[in-house]
Regions:
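Extended recognition patches within non-cytosolic domains
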Residues: 67-69, 83-88, 121-173
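A carbohydrate-recognition surface predominantly in extracellular/luminal proteins
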Residues: 1-4, 19-24, 54-60, 122-125
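Extracellular glycan-interaction patches encoded by glycine-rich segments
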Residues: 35, 39, 97-122
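Short surface loop/edge beta-strand patches of beta-sandwich-type extracellular domains
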Residues: 42-50, 111-114, 150-159
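Localized edge beta-strand/strand-to-loop motifs within extracellular or lumenal beta-rich domains
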Residues: 54-73, 130-131
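Extracellular glycan-recognition modules
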Residues: 1-31, 65-69, 133-136
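Short, aromatic/His-centered strand-loop micro-motif at the edge of beta-sheets
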Residues: 33-57
Length: 173
C-alpha cells in the first residue's frame, strides 16, 4: 500500500448494477462490503487503522452458510484476525449469496466500471471458491515469530481452487 489518508482504494470488487462486493482501504481502515438484492448492505469497517506504507497480507473469508453471523465474514491482516469493527453490519441469515461466485465483472485494484484505483502493488491475488481457508493456507510467521511472510508460490498453487478460483502470481513481474 502506498497512498495513505482519505478516499477509497479498492483491492477487489465485483459489480452488477447497484449490487456489489468489495474489499478496500477507506480512510486507513479495512472495509468489506457485500450489497446484493437479497440482503441489505453488509458493511464492515475495521477499528484497526493501516497508516503505514508497507506490505500487508490480507485474507477475507465469505462463509455465507456459517451459523454464527460474525463468522460469515472474517478478515485477517498479517495473520491477525480483525474482531473489532467500527461498523459491523454482518449478514443476518445464513445462505446469502454474493457476487463473488457469479459471472459479473471482477476487478483487482479498482472498483469495477469506475475509478477509485488502488495505489499499491498486489503481489499475489487468490480467490478460493467453496472453501473457507484460514490465513495459514497462504502465509506464516518467520522463524523469529515476528513477521508474517507469504508461503511459496508452489505451495499456494497446490491449494484447491474449485471451479471459479484463481491464483495470480505477480511476484516475478
Amino acid at each position: 500500500r502506498c497512498n495513505l489518508g482519505t478516499g477509497e482504494f479498492k483491492l477487489w470488487s465485483a459489480i452488477s448494477g447497484s449490487n456489489f462486493d468489495m474489499v478496500a482501504f477507506s480512510a486507513n481502515e479495512l472495509g468489506i462490503e457485500i450489497n446484493t438484492s437479497t440482503s441489505s448492505t453488509n458493511s464492515l469497517r475495521s477499528n484497526a487503522l493501516f497508516r503505514d506504507i508497507g506490505w500487508y497480507h490480507i485474507v477475507v473469508v465469505w462463509d455465507s452458510d456459517n451459523a454464527i453471523d460474525t463468522d460469515r465474514i472474517r478478515a485477517w491482516v498479517n495473520g491477525e484476525r480483525i474482531t473489532s469493527w467500527r461498523t459491523g453490519n454482518f449478514p443476518g441469515s445464513a445462505g446469502v449469496n454474493s457476487l463473488t461466485n457469479s459471472t459479473v465483472l471482477h476487478t483487482l485494484g479498482a472498483k469495477a466500471n469506475v475509478s477509485q484505483y488502488f495505489d499499491g502493488y498486489l503481489a499475489e491475488s487468490v480467490l478460493i471458491d467453496g472453501l473457507a481457508l484460514e490465513p495459514t493456507s497462504f502465509g506464516q510467521y518467520d522463524s523469529t515469530g515476528t513477521f508474517w511472510t507469504p508461503l511459496s508460490s508452489a505451495t499456494i498453487k497446490g491449494l484447491t481452487f474449485v471451479t471459479n478460483g484463481f491464483y495470480l502470481d505477480n511476484t516475478t513481474n
